[in-house]
Amino acid sequence: MAVYNYDVVVLGSGPAGEGAAMNAAKAGRKVAMVDSRRQVGGNCTHLGTIPSKALRHSVRQIMQFNTNPMFRAIGEPRWFSFPDVLKSAEKVISKQVASRTGYYARNRVDVFFGTGSFADEQTIEVVCANGVVEKLVAKHIIIATGSRPYRPADIDFHHPRIYDSDTILSLGHTPRKLIVYGAGVIGCEYASIFSGLGVLVELVDNRGQLLSFLDSEISQALSYHFSNNNITVRHNEEYDRVEGVDNGVILHLKSGKKIKADALLWCNGRTGNTDQLGLENIGVKVNSRGQIEVDENYRTCVQNIYGAGDVIGWPSLASAAHDQGRSAAGSIVDNGSWRFVNDVPTGIYTIPEISSIGKNEQELTQAKVPYEVGKAFFKSMARAQIAGEPQGMLKILFHRETLEVLGVHCFGYQASEIVHIGQAIMNQPGELNTLKYFVNTTFNYPTMAEAYRVAAYDGLNRLF
């Protein structure tokens, strides 16, 4: 058994692991990374964010071809199979792996491929694919092993027509009808993707409103677009049992209803990848979803062990995970890079997409903050008209007395890009965070960014 000594060992090579390893390495520390795959990137690159967003992009291109009258001169609408569309995602995955492999090589991060677990508080044993065991001894260890779909024990996920958000990427055909159980972010994104491929989608939600953490107007807009695009949303429903049959799946609901489809996609919750880490050997406990508790420095109950990313729970976003990993390493190397990541933009890649940051109307009303609203509808924006993307809006919430920007909510074309302009202004100190920035700044024309100017004028016109 070979023994290696490091300053920092990072378990996992997803966004959190990458952020941690790169920050520690650039601070001059000797760093090792352990990943259970034979390639870096984690679930984000191989099963989650990257393939699903690449898949969504391809589906949007198909939708644009099929709905734009200009293309009728070329031919009639075309429908592509799910496996064909998935091929484009696979190309992106390989490029991402190559990029990240290069990052670690240039920064002298040693990467070990195998299953890593704690032997004690400073030792990780890595069982490689060939059976060889390596021992890594480190001053500090960062757990960034991510998460996987939560799988209830009473559902047969080995049935060929029952999938979760990881295994759906192995789907070898295009179903005519699909049940998506769970209307969280992942469920809504996949409902959009399959609807764009012409699949009839039954989206089962155990809550009374889609993505209830969003501004209610944005949530209602999403519901409207879903119902307009062959997605039937069933609210306040819970599964009783899932029955896999030869020609499909039957979902039995506690309300007594039954739904039959060609396949079922389970998207109801996630579980931290902690069950094979040997945490019992170091006294670190997890909650019912396998998640680790950390303090504001991302330190666990063991002084030299940290956690970051999906494995610690909220907000379970790739963007936040990277910053959490970077901050965990910042706590170790003390290079001024630490911050507690608690105010991140939400990016939801439905069709149309959604993004937001800051407070929503419900929260401001409950807190009795005197706010006002400014809106810009994309159907009136020149750039949206040119792009053939009239659906959507930008909504700015601001303090009616100080004009401080309190929240930005966007639904539609390029929403996840547009939100960052508002984020930049909201992060300015004191009086520099003001709605007046948008009316006193020249925006390129035509752009989607100028929606901020339109929304700001709309908001100012409401004041008296």
Curated annotation (Swiss-Prot):
It catalyses: NAD(+) + NADPH = NADH + NADP(+). It holds the Pfam family Pyr_redox_dim. One of its GO terms (molecular function) is dihydrolipoyl dehydrogenase (NADH) activity. The keyword NAD applies. Coiled coil: none annotated. PANTHER family: DISULFIDE OXIDOREDUCTASE, SOLUBLE PYRIDINE NUCLEOTIDE TRANSHYDROGENASE. HAMAP family: SthA. This is Soluble pyridine nucleotide transhydrogenase.
